[in-house]
From Swiss-Prot:
GO molecular function: 3-oxo-5-alpha-steroid 4-dehydrogenase activity; polyprenal reductase activity; steroid dehydrogenase activity
Protein name: Polyprenal reductase 1
Family: Belongs to the steroid 5-alpha reductase family. Polyprenal reductase subfamily.
Pfam families for the chain: Steroid_dh
Catalysed reaction equations from the record: a di-trans,poly-cis-dolichal + NADP(+) = a di-trans,poly-cis-polyprenal + NADPH + H(+)
Subcellular location: Cell membrane
Function in brief: Plays a key role in early steps of protein N-linked glycosylation by being involved in the conversion of polyprenol into dolichol. Acts as a polyprenal reductase that mediates the reduction of polyprenal into dolichal in a NADP-dependent mechanism. Dolichols are required for the synthesis of dolichol-linked monosaccharides and the oligosaccharide precursor used for N-glycosylation. Involved in the regulation of plant growth and reproductive processes.
GO BP terms, alphabetized: dolichol biosynthetic process; dolichol-linked oligosaccharide biosynthetic process; polyprenol metabolic process
Annotated metabolic or biological route of this protein: Protein modification; protein glycosylation
Alphabetic keyword roster: Cell membrane, Membrane, NADP, Oxidoreductase, Transmembrane, Transmembrane helix
Tissue specificity as recorded in UniProt: Expressed in roots and flowers.
Endpoints of the signal sequence: none
Length: 320
């Protein structure tokens, strides 16, 4: 079962790369022969202001973005709670661990998964709050229904990718706890022990904390940039207006919130140790998808505003 889940996650990401990222790469090739293909890709991948008015068929309101993060919060919370309880059970001395590694190695592996899921939880919690209380989406802003479904899949697959190597044993642990509860009619929970609860995070290495710091750096700047974007439509009368944003990383690039997203996922990759191909595929998907979206957004800004700052790049300062 363990091998099946691990390979299922890997296969899912490879499929996502073939279906979504490969077309974006082809559409980015500067050739007039690809104009029709480029328009087709943008009709699926575009959203909001970069979605062409002629591509409104089979779309949903962009305010449905909040649905992604609700799914992300619920799913990540479940994974985090189950994995953390399993890690605490191991720390308490009652555990079943893989015979392929020592108990110390396995505890580190489980603790690292707890840390990664905790970072993801911090991320999706902020995003769901921003979706409902910070952003004021234009009533005309739309996204393709396939992009909507794909994003729902993403927020199930991404958290699972962070713990796929231990997900089967966590599932067995949860199953055994449920079976015990059903059989005995009561849970075998113990008094709360703070030291035991934080013990999964006490054995992390320097790589995890470095990655966590990079994640936090991206997280803070994304929060600031989203606050700036939200302030541009502070009043209902501004719902359909587009204004040039200024401040924080907006002084360098057109899509600093995308750059910050890539930075925080880089932090997750570093915290994971970089040994799991699923997390590499996750990071690559985020970077490729947002780089393409940033390029289209940057071109839209240049066409929309004659006084747009010439020094700004699309997403990577002084590069692109």
């Amino acid at each position: 079962m363990e091998v099946e889940i691990v390979w299922l996650v890997k296969a899912a990401w490879i499929t996502v790369w073939i279906v979504s990222i490969l077309p974006l790469v082809i559409a980015s090739i500067p050739s007039s022969k690809l104009n029709s293909f480029r328009e087709l890709v943008l009709s699926f991948a575009g959203r909001g202001k970069i979605l062409h008015p002629s591509s409104q068929k089979f779309t949903v309101p962009q305010k449905f973005f909040g649905h992604f993060y609700v799914v992300g919060v619920v799913w990540t919370t479940l994974l985090l709670a189950a994995t953390w309880m399993y890690a605490c059970k191991m720390a308490g001395g009652s555990h079943v661990f893989s015979f392929h590694m020592t108990h110390v190695e396995h505890r580190f592996k489980v603790g690292r998964a707890v840390f990664l899921l905790l970072l993801m939880e911090i991320h999706v919690l902020r995003r769901v709050i921003e979706s409902f209380y910070v952003f004021k989406y234009s009533t005309s802003a739309r996204m393709h229904i396939l992009a909507y479904v794909g994003a729902l899949f993403y927020y199930v697959a991404a958290p699972l990718s962070l713990c796929s190597n231990i997900a089967p044993e966590v599932a067995r642990f949860v199953g055994s706890q449920v079976a015990e509860f059903i059989a005995s009619g009561k849970s075998h929970s113990h008094d709360f022990n703070l030291l035991l609860s934080i013990s999964p995070l006490m054995k992390l290495g320097s790589l995890q904390w470095i990655g966590g710091a990079i994640f936090l750096w991206g997280w803070i700047h994304q929060r600031r940039c989203h606050a700036i974007l939200g302030s541009l439509r502070e009043y209902p009368s501004q719902a359909k207006e587009y204004i040039i944003p200024y401040g924080d990383w907006f002084e360098m690039v057109s899509c600093p919130h995308f750059l910050a997203e890539i930075v925080l996922y880089l932090g997750l990759l570093i915290s994971s140790g970089g040994t799991d191909i699923s997390i590499w595929l996750l990071f690559g998907f985020v970077a490729a998808n947002l780089t393409y979206a940033a390029g289209e957004t940057h071109r839209w800004y240049l066409q929309k505003f004659e006084n747009y700052p010439a020094s700004r790049h699309a997403i990577f300062p002084h590069v692109y």
